[in-house]
């Protein structure tokens, strides 16, 4: 955590505010090279400079050539603890180099005018922070909810104009909505609160906004992973104040590329499958008179296997078994990361994937023999990687993405096979990002 705070302080050292044209020129002559390299890596510097210049140019057209800041908030990848957060278990996640960036112009009114590539957002007046049923599931509700969360805690908010673009994959387990929430929270923190609000506090406000204003049940995993930076070990046993530990670690330092593969399977009509996972887990915990599975032990579960089979279901028992072994595995993964033990870490990643496939059962869709893309991706990963590397289903499962740690020497072969099967650009070679939401300039 100390390293992450030091890095964040350096990145947030903005210097004099510049108009957008001057920021573009500063990027062209290399004045932001060091910061951009820190965020995205040396090999991505050229492409990121082009990206930033294009976003700034569009912002100038929309917002005028005003004094501005650039903000960035990362997506995340789940590393361990598949479907454990909703049972108040342990999780390991990491911030990644795919992010949402925004050019922001402060205003002296209460209006947030937010422009984003690909969709339109109505202006939000922060004088009205009431919950609006008509805004359910909208970007406007998230902005209003974050502002409400700030004011409830005694923080300041104010207006701004912004233009943003994101390369965080929507629906791929990278938490694009949480990245947006962290972005807005970081903007309010820097513009109106002297950047004094902690990453953890910004994450909690984002969760509040999503639950209460966006009206979607959300744990704290996504927001915390996007806000804290680097690898983060989380323990949700204390629901209101989860324990979060940032762990500096980079698989690339040990010869592995972190690759997510989007199998291009539709999430449509899968809501029942997703909701069945926490429902069945909680049905088991209820049998023990507990709210969630983290409040029982593996020995208690095993001793009551017959009762669970009779009174709930076989699958519910298996999913509970997955949770209790997976939450402990996440703890062991965090310990391996702290000790820089890549061998143990990768073994645990494979064990996590095995448990998700066998016991959690979120790889195959029941009754659908025509659509088993995640299973195919895992089979191909096993073929290429063998015993060197690791692979697992990533995120909610049933569709979406798988995660693999691929030796550098096999990366080209791995990506080629995946693209031949699932289509061009289905693979995302990720870089671990050592900080969460920041003000770049």
Language model regions located:
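Alpha/beta catalytic cores of group-transfer enzymes, especially the acyltransferase/condensing modules
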Residues: 194-242, 352, 378-381, 391-394
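Glycine- and acidic-rich phosphate- and metal-coordinating loops
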Residues: 147-170
């Amino acid at each position: 955590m100390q390293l992450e705070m030091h890095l964040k302080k350096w990145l947030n050292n903005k210097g004099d505010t510049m108009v957008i044209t001057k920021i573009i020129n500063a990027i062209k002559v290399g004045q932001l090279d060091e910061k951009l390299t820190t965020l995205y890596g040396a090999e991505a510097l050229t492409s990121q400079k082009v990206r930033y210049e294009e976003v700034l140019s569009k912002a100038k057209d929309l917002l005028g050539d005003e004094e501005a800041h650039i903000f960035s908030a990362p997506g995340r990848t789940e590393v361990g603890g598949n479907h454990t957060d909703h049972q108040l278990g342990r999780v390991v996640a990491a911030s990644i180099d795919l992010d949402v960036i925004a050019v922001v112009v402060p205003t002296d009114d209460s209006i947030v005018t937010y422009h984003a590539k690909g969709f339109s957002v109505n202006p939000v007046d922060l004088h009205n922070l009431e919950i609006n049923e008509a805004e359910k599931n909208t970007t406007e509700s998230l902005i209003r909810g974050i502002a409400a969360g700030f004011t409830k805690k005694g923080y300041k908010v104010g207006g701004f104009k912004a233009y943003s673009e994101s390369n965080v994959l929507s629906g791929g387990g990278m938490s694009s909505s949480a990245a947006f929430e962290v972005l807005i929270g970081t903007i309010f923190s820097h513009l109106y609160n002297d950047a004094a609000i902690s990453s953890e506090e910004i994450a909690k406000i984002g969760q509040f906004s999503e639950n209460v204003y966006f009206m979607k049940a959300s744990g704290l995993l996504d927001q915390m992973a996007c806000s804290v930076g680097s690898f983060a070990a989380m323990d949700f046993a204390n629901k209101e104040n989860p324990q979060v530990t940032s762990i500096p670690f980079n698989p690339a330092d040990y010869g592995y590329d972190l690759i997510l593969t989007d199998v291009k399977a539709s999430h449509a009509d899968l809501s029942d499958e997703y909701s069945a996972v926490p429902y069945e887990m909680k049905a088991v915990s209820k049998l023990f008179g507990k709210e969630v599975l983290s409040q029982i032990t593996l020995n208690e579960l095993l001793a009551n296997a017959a009762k669970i089979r009779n009174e709930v279901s076989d699958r519910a028992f298996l999913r509970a078994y997955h949770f209790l072994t997976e939450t402990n595995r996440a703890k062991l993964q965090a310990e391996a990361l702290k000790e820089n033990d890549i061998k143990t870490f990768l073994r645990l990643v494979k064990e996590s994937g095995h448990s998700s496939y066998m016991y959690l059962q979120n790889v195959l869709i029941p009754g659908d023999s025509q659509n088993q893309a995640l299973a195919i991706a895992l089979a191909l990963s096993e073929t290429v990687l063998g015993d060197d590397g690791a692979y697992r289903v990533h995120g909610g499962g049933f569709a979406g993405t798988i995660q693999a740690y691929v030796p550098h020497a096999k990366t080209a072969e791995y990506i080629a096979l995946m693209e031949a099967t699932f289509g061009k650009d289905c693979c995302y070679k990720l870089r671990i990002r050592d900080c969460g939401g920041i003000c770049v300039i």
